Amino acid sequence: MSEELLNTTVEQEYDASQIQVLEGLEAVRKRPGMYIGSTSASGLHHLVYEIVDNAIDEALAGYCTHITVTINPGDTITVTDNGRGIPVDIQAQTGRPALEVVYTVLHAGGKFGGGGYKVSGGLHGVGASVVNALSEWLTVEVHKEGKIYQMKFARGNITQEMRVIGNTDRHGTIVTFKPDPEMFDTLIYDYETLHTRMREQAFLNAGLRIEIADRRTEDGPSDSMCYEGGIREFVLWHNRHKTPLHEEVVYMAGVRRDAEAEVALQYHDGYNETIVSFANNIHTPEGGMHETGFKTALTRVLNAYGTKTGVIKTDADKVSGEDCREGLTAVISVKLTDAQFEGQTKAKLGNAYIRTLVDSIVNEQLSTYFEEHPAVARTILEKAMTANRAREAARKARELSLIHISEPTRPRLIS
């Protein structure tokens, strides 16, 4: 077996000649997985998300109301927004146009100083340049102050300096790119994958219209999404094939310390738990502090209400967190100025104070909601207590089964 193991021994002397300095965007092309997670289909689609995230940052800042994503023939992508347009004036530190800096320098953008954006979802400020580095070619057009500015790149290198190509009465940014076949295992975009992500973003940004179209065929699918109800409608969408236990979606929101949180929830008659969380519009599939705060407060509020109304009489009657979340559909969305994600792909939110914020909002507002809607509160509490009883019954059954298995079998006497 030992012959099959990788030999990790290095014979060469370890000196300065082994130290590589990667200039510009070389680091991205050398280790793309560090920036987009993988070079599989997931990473391919991540390129689109990064450009869209930049457009959504404009929406969060209050300047963008419409985003369009187009899959073109040949699986190139065009993302159009009606935001302010990427700055085109000279950036002081580099002496180069800001547009060039955004697309050619890692960790460059309007997200670091706090002046350009209060909150943002882009990939730690490296999204545009990473997409550029991993594209066979990329063209960006900026409509700003009556002029159309254009710049072109190939694999992160400038092929056309920024220049004015016309006049316009619009404002915003248009980015078109072709993923580099040298970088990715697949180059075929899946419409449904992109559609799901765009629908998600439309729910999270109430009133923002996002359109997506597949132009690879004449009759390709398209959709236009705008949800004035925001995450309330997101919860209803998740429960569209379920039977809700209460008609109204419970909605809670609040602001503390330059951070805001909103939570929407509704219970159904099923048994599965669905909690979908986001930070600055970025899905956090592994949860994080915002989910922890929500779960803790939900359990506390239900037990407090049950105790206050006499439904919960002893500690043994108290419901666990798992009991409280049976049949629950919830969407949690937080926006904060200094989001700390664990990992470049933002799977988990790490800001500790967000836990306190979400806990406080849910504790206060859900308690008030239960006081004002006792019928809904009783329905939810009864479901949790039913789950508790079922869990206890299952535990006792397992214990009896273990006792039965552990009992020695007595030999029978044969007369």
Task: Tell me the role of every PLM-derived stretch.
Residues I19-L22, S42-H45, E100:
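Alpha-helical membrane and juxtamembrane elements of multi-pass inner-membrane transport
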Residues I414-S415:
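Hydrophobic alpha-helical segments, chiefly the membrane-spanning helices
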Residues K30-Y49:
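Conserved short strand/loop->alpha-helix "switch" segment adjacent to the catalytic nucleotide/phosphoryl-transfer site
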Residues I86-G109:
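Short conserved segment of the HATPase_c
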Residues S17-K30:
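Mature N-terminal segment immediately following signal peptide/propeptide cleavage
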Residues S17, S40, Q91-G95, Y227:
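Residue-level signature of the cytosolic catalytic core of signaling kinases
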Residues S2-D15, L25, Y49, D57-A59, ...:
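GHKL-family ATPase ATP-binding module
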